[in-house]
């Protein structure tokens, strides 16, 4: 059941996940304009970082137009009400980077690991709590493990000090039943004081629906982005999600019209590749592939004269996870030397 008295914590990710859609090339002026619009529209937090988190700017993931600290400082100087969040992947970002991000203005951190690797988040979660940050555990590619196993990992993050645990559908591969099962499993083991969050991707066009189902099962925080700006087919489109929950009578604290205008007038014109469900982004959701693989895969397909869809299907068959972007070229080279075996149906295993 929905609690119409409870306010949804609206977490915008346009300036972090949305980085993937522009190959991490937001200008500082872009960041300022987007942040101001979001702040005025009433979101609770604005996540700011390279698409792959603090220190993600690299040959493997793509170099950013600016440093994380430059983006964070500009946004922190712009907003008047919203909190500044950032993302950290252990092994890419360090506690030193987290300390600097906090000093630059970030008061919320989401510590992200693969859904079966919560163990590697302990140092970073504990350090974030020492800094006094709102500390979130972020279990990526949550479709790749069972609800019960995911709950075990969530409990680990809680034991390290995380105040909120996210179900993260990085591949946009889950449906409403998958989401319900995972939130029920988390609620069964987490302390009632520990919040939960939902990070959806729209590769199967279920980003908004999955976010609403998460709310039905007690979710506290919802990630979304203007126009869905994000990896793959994007995240749950913020303006659509808020319009939908507004019609349901749920409390969100946002100005629907301001979000719609910001999406159309500020963010959509920045899309160099339309953020939408199409052949390649649908392949991500169908095959359960990490959404940020999209642009890297399209580049490899162009370079080697291959079909991006088939590369993505093969990546799904091999169960590649976030951080294995370097394997995209390996897969492409393998496909050049032999005809892919199996069918698309071989990719899916529920």
Curated annotation (Swiss-Prot):
GO molecular function term, any single one: manganese ion binding
Active site: 20
Pfam families on file: DmpG_comm (PF07836), HMGL-like (PF00682)
Function of the molecule: Catalyzes the retro-aldol cleavage of 4-hydroxy-2-oxopentanoate to pyruvate and acetaldehyde. Is involved in the meta-cleavage pathway for the degradation of p-cumate.
Gene3D superfamilies: 1.10.8.60, Aldolase class I (3.20.20.70)
Reaction equations catalysed: (S)-4-hydroxy-2-oxopentanoate = acetaldehyde + pyruvate
Residue positions binding substrate: 16-17, 170, 199, 290
Family affiliation: Belongs to the 4-hydroxy-2-oxovalerate aldolase family.
CDD domains assigned to the protein according to its UniProt record, in alphabetical order: DRE_TIM_HOA
Functional pathway: Aromatic compound metabolism; p-cumate degradation; acetaldehyde and pyruvate from p-cumate: step 7/7
UniProt organism field: Pseudomonas putida (strain ATCC 700007 / DSM 6899 / JCM 31910 / BCRC 17059 / LMG 24140 / F1)
Binding site for Mn(2+): 17, 199, 201
Stretches assigned to the Pyruvate carboxyltransferase domain: 8-260
PANTHER family: 2-ISOPROPYLMALATE SYNTHASE 1, CHLOROPLASTIC-RELATED, HOMOCITRATE SYNTHASE-RELATED
Protein name in the entry: 4-hydroxy-2-oxovalerate aldolase 2
Alphabetic keyword roster: Aromatic hydrocarbons catabolism, Lyase, Manganese, Metal-binding
Record flagged with keyword Kinase: no
EC code: 4.1.3.39
Top-level taxonomic group: Bacteria
Keyword Glycosyltransferase annotated: no
Site feature: Transition state stabilizer: 16
GO biological process: catabolic process; L-leucine biosynthetic process
